[in-house]
């Protein structure tokens, strides 16, 4: 199977909700700190190359519902995937099948973690949005015609962002954390 090793690292309420008032309580904030430290802290439990969230979680925490600044007359971009910084080291993968996120930068910061943005799009996303991403240096992969093809997305992520481990001189296994927490501070 040509897919990255994916594991879910979630913070949720006892009723299964991933968003809610519980996150603002002292206990919720303490759990949020532990959530970050386990996955991203100075000595993380996971040694991953990126994490993945959906469009709404991305909008809630990073793009804040900004509209993309599209140029409908942008020159036609080449078909297919675009990987701007394959060796960045840490990646934030945003599943945005319809191309709606209003990014301002090709990187984002989550507490002490800086990551290169990789968008997962479908073929139906127009040239203007793809040109917008390229102009900002944001990577993207195409996974599906009109609906997201999850298997293809995972295969492409492993293929496109897997990189050599400079310490061991070997290929690192592409690993992604799939958080379901709305609290990314």
Located regions from the model:
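N-terminal nucleotide/polyanion-binding subdomain common to many enzyme families
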Residues: 1-110
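Short beta-strand/loop segments at the ligand-binding rim of alpha/beta enzyme cores
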Residues: 26-29, 90-91, 113-116, 159-165
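Hydrophobic, well-structured mid-protein blocks that either form specific transmembrane helices
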Residues: 97-139
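Histidine (H) residue identity feature
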Residues: 9, 47-48, 116, 150, ...
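Short, well-ordered alpha-helix to beta-strand connector turns
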Residues: 47-49, 89, 115, 137, ...
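A glycine-rich beta-strand to alpha-helix segment
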Residues: 124-185
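Short, surface-exposed, polar/charged, turn-prone segments marking secondary-structure boundaries
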Residues: 34-41, 78-82, 120-124, 146-149, ...
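Short, hydrophobic beta-strand segments that form beta-sheet elements in well-ordered domains
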Residues: 51-52, 93-94, 118-123, 167-168
């Amino acid at each position: 199977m040509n897919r990255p090793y994916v594991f879910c690292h979630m913070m949720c309420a006892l009723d299964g909700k991933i968003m809610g008032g519980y996150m603002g309580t002292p206990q919720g904030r303490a759990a949020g700190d532990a959530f970050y430290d386990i996955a991203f802290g100075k000595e993380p439990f996971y040694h991953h190359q990126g994490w993945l969230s959906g469009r709404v979680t991305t909008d809630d925490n990073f793009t804040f519902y900004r509209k993309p600044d599209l140029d409908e007359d942008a020159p036609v971009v080449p078909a297919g995937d675009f990987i701007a910084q394959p060796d960045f080291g840490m990646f934030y993968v945003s599943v945005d099948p319809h191309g709606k996120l209003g990014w301002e930068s090709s990187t984002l910061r989550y507490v002490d973690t800086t990551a290169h943005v990789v968008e997962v799009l479908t073929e139906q996303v127009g040239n203007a949005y793809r040109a917008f991403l390229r102009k900002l240096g944001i990577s993207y992969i195409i996974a599906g015609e009109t609906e997201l093809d999850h298997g293809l997305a995972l295969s492409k992520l492993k293929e496109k962002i897997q990189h050599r481990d400079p310490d061991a001189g070997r290929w690192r296994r592409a690993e992604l954390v799939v958080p379901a927490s709305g609290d990314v501070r």
